[in-house]
């Protein structure tokens, strides 16, 4: 018993330390480049921003399955990961190289289908990142497995700042959307070199037929799920670009990026360590379930008020940060910021289900989401434009995806009643934040003051909610230090 408690304490310490590094990494990666991103948006305008968005959508779609899901097996592998790393390297690089060639050749067709054939060279440059990603998929998974978030933080910071600096410099010289593509590619190369340097395992290729079946049984369902997840996540941008053109896509993507801030700040650091932390507790399902509800409660206290404040104050936020040229994106941000709160919940549930081996359930959920949202968005895009597409996404997520995740979690041993209680007060309080933020937007004429008022209100609500759960916060902080009972 003592041994189990000490092992759990060790895992908690590692996960806690990794989460702190991951959270710092995310905040630093976002706050600095935020200002560079604002400058780039003002320099490029919606049209060029939309051209780059076409290339980004293409890249993200391919990266969702480029290594066939096998690198994530590294995290779950109970034995020494060195036994499967050479094989996962081979699979990742071969599949990524083939996909890179396919995208480069098919770039003109892809660009035309997504709204602007002028995006072709940008798509081709961005496609080179696919093979780079495949090259370091296994080292990245190993760093995550070993909670080496300090090294990952440094690599991410170099990638972020280097890419942003190159992009801004080229944009000032009139390179347009290509400036963003080149900055991304150069930074990806440097990032890959750093991960290869810091990986605890030497980089080797190999082919072990004895483990191929096990790898593919785990990876293929996860890759298929990621494809459906990507299709579901980017179908809105594909529809906006193909139907309304690059200018409308630029407006939509700007709103999407703004709405993704709460997801990036609060969810992504957790996702960097949650799979490994959950995996370490797989032999104790009740503890996993309790930890899930506890993390969900704390995450909701912080993230939901921010998302709804951003939604209510969308107009002054866009006007102050990006200027009048981007004001039309406020109608999109209103819906996507509210959707961000649901996305944070979904990502936590996704990681939990994957760790316990329910990747098939995740695939079903994402397939249902895609099947329902696609026709709804297609019906909404013509009469209501890009804002209608955003509203359709929110409606489907609330009415279809949320219940499906709840059912899957219940079948996996999570007490949904506990989870519902965990989010009831944060959600109920945050719902009151939205009309207050909207009122600030309507009655305060100066955009900066309206946005600041909404932000201060959200901060006050977060403080009150977190204070209410201060015992849980203290328990999480101290659990890693516990020597007797965790």
Feature-to-residue mapping (PLM):
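Signature of the first transmembrane helix
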Residues: 3, 11-68, 95-107, 124, ...
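Helix-loop junctions and terminal segments of transmembrane helices
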Residues: 33, 65-82, 144-145, 255, ...
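Membrane-interface junctions at transmembrane-helix termini in multi-pass inner-membrane proteins
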Residues: 16, 73-82, 132-158, 173, ...
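Membrane-interface helix-loop junctions in multi-pass transport and translocation proteins
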Residues: 39-56, 108, 112, 120-121, ...
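Alpha-helical transmembrane segments of multi-pass membrane transport and lipid-handling proteins
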Residues: 1-4, 27, 90-115, 121-125, ...
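N-terminal membrane topogenesis motif
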Residues: 1-34, 75, 79-90, 117-119, ...
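Interhelical loop/hinge segments that connect adjacent transmembrane helices in multipass membrane
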Residues: 2-11, 15, 150, 193-234, ...
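Membrane-proximal transmembrane or re-entrant/amphipathic helices at the cytosolic face
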Residues: 1-9, 414-416, 423, 435-486
């Amino acid at each position: 018993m003592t041994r189990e408690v000490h092992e759990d304490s060790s895992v908690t310490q590692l996960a806690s330390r990794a989460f702190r590094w991951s959270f710092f990494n995310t905040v630093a990666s976002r706050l600095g480049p935020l200002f560079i991103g604002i400058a780039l948006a003002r320099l490029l305008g919606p049209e060029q921003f939309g051209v780059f968005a076409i290339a980004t959508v293409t890249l993200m779609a391919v990266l969702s399955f480029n290594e066939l899901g096998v690198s994530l097996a590294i995290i779950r592998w109970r034995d020494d990961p060195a036994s499967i790393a050479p094989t996962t390297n081979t699979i990742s690089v071969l599949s990524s190289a083939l996909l890179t060639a396919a995208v480069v050749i098919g770039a003109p067709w892809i660009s035309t289908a997504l709204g602007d054939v002028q995006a072709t060279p940008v798509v081709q440059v961005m496609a080179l990142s696919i093979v780079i990603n495949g090259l370091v998929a296994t080292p990245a998974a190993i760093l995550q497995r070993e909670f080496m978030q300090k090294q990952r933080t440094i690599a991410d910071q170099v990638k972020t700042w280097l890419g942003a600096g190159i992009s801004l410099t080229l944009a000032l010289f009139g390179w347009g959307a290509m400036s963003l593509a080149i900055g991304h590619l150069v930074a990806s190369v440097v990032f890959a070199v750093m991960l290869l340097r810091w990986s605890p395992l030497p980089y080797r290729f190999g082919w072990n037929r004895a483990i191929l079946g096990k790898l593919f049984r785990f990876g293929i369902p996860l890759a298929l799920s990621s494809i459906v997840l990507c299709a579901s996540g980017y179908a809105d941008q594909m529809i906006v670009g193909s139907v309304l053109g690059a200018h409308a896509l630029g407006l939509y993507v700007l709103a999407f990026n703004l709405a993704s801030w709460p997801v990036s700040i609060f969810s992504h650091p957790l996702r960097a360590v949650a799979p490994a932390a959950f995996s370490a507790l797989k032999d104790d399902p009740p503890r996993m379930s309790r930890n899930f509800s506890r993390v969900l409660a704390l995450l909701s206290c912080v993230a939901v008020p921010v998302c709804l404040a951003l939604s209510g104050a969308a107009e002054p936020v866009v006007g102050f940060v990006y200027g009048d040229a981007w004001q039309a994106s406020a109608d999109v941000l209103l819906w996507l910021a509210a959707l961000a709160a649901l996305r944070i919940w979904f990502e936590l549930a996704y990681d939990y289900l994957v760790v316990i081996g329910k990747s098939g359930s995740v695939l079903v959920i994402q397939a249902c989401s895609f099947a329902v949202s696609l026709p709804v968005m297609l019906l909404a895009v013509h009469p209501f434009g890009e804002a209608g597409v955003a509203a359709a996404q929110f409606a489907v997520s609330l009415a279809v995806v949320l219940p499906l995740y709840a059912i899957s979690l219940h079948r996996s041993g999570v007490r949904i009643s506990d989870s519902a209680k965990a989010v009831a007060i944060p959600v109920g309080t945050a719902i009151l934040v939205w009309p207050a933020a909207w009122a600030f937007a309507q009655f305060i004429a100066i955009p900066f003051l309206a946005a600041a008022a909404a932000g201060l209100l959200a901060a006050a609500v977060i403080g009150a909610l977190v204070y209410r759960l201060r015992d849980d916060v203290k328990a999480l902080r101290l659990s890693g230090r516990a020597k007797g009972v965790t």
